[in-house]
Amino acid sequence: MKGPILMALGLAWASLQLPAADWPQWRGPNRDGAAPAGQKLPAQLTEEPRVVWRIPAGPGLSSPVIAGGKVLAFDAQAGQETLRLLDAADGRELWRAAVDQPFSDSQGPTGPRGTPMIDGDRVYAVSCRGELQCRALADGKLVWRTSYVTNWGATFVGEKGAIPGAARHGNNGAPVLHGDLLIANVGGTNGAGVVAFDKRTGELRWKSQNDQAAYAPPVVATVAGIEQVISFTADGGLGLAVPDGRFLWRFPIKTAFARHVGAPVIFGDRVILGSHQAGLFGLAITRDGDRQEAQPAWSSKEVAINFASPVRVGQQLYGLGPAKDLFCLDVADGKIRWKQPGLPMGAPDKAWVSLLVVGDKILALSDAGV
């Protein structure tokens, strides 16, 4: 939420005559920026969408999420990073809960940067400073909590010196829910780079590696025959087996300040990830027994992504590259289909755009609000 107003997004979608659907986490039900199958956008709007309700929103970069007729917002309120549950029908506030003190730097507004999640009767959120909380959906009461810094040895110093990744600009990447696990890029020490918690109790299920956290959220997918969590950490791409955190593969990517923001995109046995400095990589993941190997099938600096996570539609990948250019490339071989100037945006080195796939169309919202 970048501006001062939060609108009922679920009802805005309804004004486009889309079937009702939950959007319970960052980038939607499948965490890939795609609306559920069967939803379509009209060729054009016959009338201006009607604003059903609006409420003031505090600073932050978190997205609201929707489930079961409820909207969960995460913004700065009264000097705290705060969760608020709203009624989707009328915007009425049902409860609010302070999560952590806010964080500010030169890269964005003072407020949370990671998107919360709704899962059944629980909600989950992580603050910029690494305070991870699980609360009851019904009343917002705290169920369990943990601190990336205090409990797991992660570093958080803010915008100081040359410290890279989430330790510098905050924990932006929302953890991923899978089965009974909540898996997070904690960035801790003593093997707590990636940590899987029991989502109901917060108890440790496994921890793995010593990677520092960057900004990209983890995703879960079956790649080369093994179900795994794929993280884009300050050290590069990383694959770990979901049940036990067993190491599978690694692809080193080192950049200044570890500005690794875009979420990994999965296409069969390919993992696509990249940054503004290293470029975009299409990694081929192969299997050798219980281990795997990652090798670049293709790479491109011509369409290096920065803050915006790309989306896949069929055999093509769409994203925002350098100089604010929208691009389309073939995911199989990395061949660029086209690139062109996109929506009105800010400075090229800080521009971002949110891309959502609805049927055969892409919705795009730029940092200029267009």
Predicted regions: what they are:
Residues 4-17:
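Bacterial N-terminal signal peptides
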Residues 1-2, 270:
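Intrinsically disordered, low-complexity proline-rich regions
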